[in-house]
Amino acid sequence: MRQPGIAYFDLNGLKKINDLQGHQAGDALIRRTAECILQAFGKKAYRIDGDEFIVIDRESGREAFHACVENALRAMEESHIAISCGISWRAERGNIDEQINEADKKMYLAKRDFYACKEHDRRHYWPEQE
């Protein structure tokens, strides 16, 4: 079975939006984020926590998967959504749990960098940046 591409997304600054603008604004942000991810990936995307989303793509090749990630990130950037993203792609080794953990770790690295360097609206890590 082909190993999937995994993309793990997490909103940056949702708590601040909820605190300053109210939970309706935060909910609207979550819905818009979901729309951007769904437009790029369709039924391969899942909301797994309040402001976290995961994509499990077993169908696309590496280049097409990366293009979908870029499309989702671009749509969020155009909507002024600050997001952290980590991805994992393994064509032949590992299992899906390892891939999800790898993507999750990369997402947290991106989130750490976002908060360390706030002039950036979003950051993401590709597997090649290890």
Each model region followed by its residue ranges:
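Short catalytic/binding micro-motifs of nucleotide second-messenger systems
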Residues: 40-44, 67-82
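Alpha-helix N-cap recognition
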Residues: 13, 61, 92-96
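Conserved long alpha-helical elements within nucleotide-processing catalytic cores of c-di-GMP signaling
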Residues: 1-6, 12-39, 46-50, 54-55, ...
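Catalytic-core segments of nucleotide cyclases and related cyclic-nucleotide turnover enzymes
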Residues: 66-74, 88-120, 128-130
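Gram-positive cell-envelope targeting signals
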Residues: 8, 20, 126-130
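Short beta-strand-to-loop capping motifs
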Residues: 55-60, 89-91
